[in-house]
Amino acid sequence: MRVGYGYDVHRLVDGRPLVLGGVTIPFDKGLKGHSDADVLLHAVCDALLGAAGLGDIGMHFPDKDPKYKNIASTRLLEETGRKIAQEGYKIVNLDATLVAEAPKIGPYRQEMVSVIAKCLGLENRQVNVKATTTEGLGITGRGEGMAATCVACLE
């Protein structure tokens, strides 16, 4: 059994769609980044890569590479899943947490779980997505950005 931990944070900005867990969510701001800036999927990728001893998302999908400009993070997750499989690992489960004051993800949570599971060839029961706030503290609490964490177990 191998365990990996992923963390990511992105700034909220005007003029971009908000994509979380592969789902576009109605909101007045989106996340800034080279790709679609899906903070949740980036944390999932980092957790998986870490568990397999394959470094991090920046090593595999550098933000200076133009081919990743505005790429859907679901594509990055699919490629991460292929890399994990090529190393001979199977994903046991994922547990991801979004850290943000708004929007509430309850109405979108199950769709996020389904998207992540589909990208990785998993059953929905192998993927957990939840959210929390920082009670108004820090960059997420002030609404300046969003963060996400993820724990991945491989065998």
From Swiss-Prot:
Cofactor, how bound (note): Binds 1 divalent metal cation per subunit.
Pathway: Isoprenoid biosynthesis; isopentenyl diphosphate biosynthesis via DXP pathway; isopentenyl diphosphate from 1-deoxy-D-xylulose 5-phosphate: step 4/6
Annotated catalysed reactions: 4-CDP-2-C-methyl-D-erythritol 2-phosphate = 2-C-methyl-D-erythritol 2,4-cyclic diphosphate + CMP
GO biological process terms held by the UniProt record: isopentenyl diphosphate biosynthetic process, methylerythritol 4-phosphate pathway; terpenoid biosynthetic process
Entries under PROSITE patterns matching the protein: ISPF
Co-factor requirement: a divalent metal cation
A GO term, aspect molecular function: 2-C-methyl-D-erythritol 2,4-cyclodiphosphate synthase activity
Site annotation Transition state stabilizer: residues: H34, T133
EC number: 4.6.1.12
Name under which the protein is recorded: 2-C-methyl-D-erythritol 2,4-cyclodiphosphate synthase
Organism: Desulfatibacillum aliphaticivorans
Gene name of this polypeptide: ispF
